[in-house]
Amino acid sequence: ELALVSGFTDNRPLVSVVSEALARSAKHKLIGYSGMSGSLGKSNWRVLSPTFEAKEAQDSNDASLVLAFRFDGYNLLTLGDLGEDGQRRLMRSSFPWLVQLRKAPLVLKVAHHGSKDQSVELHSLIQPDIALISVGAQNDYGHPTRSLLSMLQGLGTSTLRTDIHGAISLRIEDDRLVAATGGKLSM
């Protein structure tokens, strides 16, 4: 098994605990960096951000691994916890890749549980067809924010949220993307 991690130096105690657990469970731990690519099953992936040491990052959220996946006529962009500044930086450093993602239906894993720290410009550029928001029910942070949900609605993006729909899985069936939520098929 392979674990891909950010090269950002983070000295918080919980990071050490997670790193130790990862060392016990993963056969290989690699630092993901912009330009790194590979395959996973039928999909191809590419790291769009950060750089190897993530020196451009202000904090661990800003150093989130951003990956683009291409599979069976669909694309997936995962933003981790990347905030608005990082999303703008991503647009500058990976603009051609982001434009390419629009050539097929795009699924977006929304950054940071749908916090308000989002780039309208990035979302307008990529115009995701489906947005996945991983967020706890009745969380104290107010995630996802109304501004994010309004932005996605304005872009015509279908939204799936773990706080409403439970566990979410996607699969391709007869060249269509099918979502299963909470154990039941939808979309």
Predicted feature descriptions by range:
Residues 1-187:
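Non-globular, low-confidence helical/coil segments that flank catalytic cores
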